[in-house]
Amino acid sequence: MAAAAAGGAPGPAPGPSRPAPAARNPPAVPRRRGDSRRRQAALFFLNNISLDGRPPSLGPGGEKPAPPPPPPTEAREAPAPPPAPPGGLPGLPARPAPQGLLSPTTAPAGLGLDGQRQRRRVTSQRCSLEFLEDTVGCASVQRTKHASGSPRHKGLKKTHFIKNMRQYDTKNSRIVLICAKRSLCAAFSVLPYGEGLRISDLRVDSQKQRHPSGGVSVSSEMVFELEGVELGADGKVVSYAKFLYPTNALVIHKNDSHGLLPQPRPSIPRAPPGSRHKPVPTKSTPAGTELGSDGGDAVEYNPNLLDDPQWPCGKHKRVLIFASYMTTVIEYVKPADLKKDMNETFREKFPHIKLTLSKIRSLKREMRNLSEECSLEPVTVSMAYVYFEKLVLQGKLNKQNRKLCAGACVLLAAKISSDLRKSEVKQLIDKLEERFRFNRKDLIGFEFTVLVALELALYLPENQVLPHYRRLTQQF
């Protein structure tokens, strides 16, 4: 017994030392099992993705897809070791089960085929997943573009690589300059210039007729032209040299054989030294001798004519003259009758003016209110009044172009008398567009027309500006 105990003592000693590696292996088993479950869930999720629009619960034939087979990695996993018998007898057959992992059997061949199939399936699923992600990404980008309001491009325009531009018609197309290696140098578009292609002309029938005055239809000739003002349209060259006169006294004009040079306008009033305003010559020549003159030009401008306080009285006043003083008695009359009487009296005295006196004063009030909103100085408003009244007295205004003329006069006066920045000019144009309800493109195009109608005389003498300035300062 002692020998058996002594001889059997070494028997169980290697037993506890052998399962030492086996004791380290079991922690890897749950990890591989968890990986297989994750892979199985991923494959099941990818299989349920429908690329043809069918619901994921139905297959191609309308049948439910079979559940995925169990992963082959589970066959490789070692079963849980049985509990050790009591007493630790070595004669129990406890080793054949783990021996199957190391013994060469037919299972590895089947497992290799299943592994290859699984790899192919995973590869195909990855490819399909990448394709799906690309498709969804493109769709999302398109949805965001269309949701933002940008129009869909039906098709790209054809691109031509040309060397001679005379062989191709580049109308309504974009021209791109490239190098020999086809790298971009510059891209630009050519916009044609002409009276027939003006955007404002196309908008006359659509936008301008929404707010007509007096039920009068708006035409392009009335809106964009002033009566008696000739512009260089349809390729015609028009010279405005007749509106210029020499200011340098050292220049000596010599007569040549072709004819006499035009003499400077006589009796030119000079502005005092240090003044910014350019003097305007008086009209001493008879009407018709100068180019571009009409019936309204022969009368010298009077800044107190349209602002005479006697106009609102009309025929409803009675003048009483006494020995030492004179007084006026005005009877009570309805405002509508007084306004009608005033306009009739004004039309009788100035038959060539197409606007009523009440409408002229209403436009001047709009100009003053606009100048207050834009913080313009009273001298700027006074100059705008002078420009506007000159056009009125010349008979160049009508019901269609009166607002454009008023806006252009304010814009010219602000540019010539104030040191405005770009942002301030933009703000002024926005205010003009909002108050007078016209398009800014029409205003900018009409600005030069008003400048020609004023004979390029934007610098005014003080005797024309000061009366308006005094009245404005009293009102402010």
Curated annotation (Swiss-Prot):
The modification Phosphoserine is found at S128, S206. It comes from the Eukaryota. Residues 65-96, 263-272 have a biased composition (Pro residues). InterPro entries: CABLES1/2 (IPR012388), Cyclin-like_sf (IPR036915), Cyclin_N (IPR006671). Residues 30-40 have a biased composition (Basic residues). Widely expressed. Keywords: Cell cycle, Cell division, Cyclin, Phosphoprotein. SUPFAM superfamilies: Cyclin-like. GO terms for biological process: cell division; regulation of cell cycle. Disulfide bonds: none annotated. Pfam families: Cyclin_N. Residues 1-119, 256-295 are annotated as: Disordered. Belongs to the cyclin family. Unknown. Probably involved in G1-S cell cycle transition. This is CDK5 and ABL1 enzyme substrate 2. It comes from Mus musculus. The gene is Cables2.
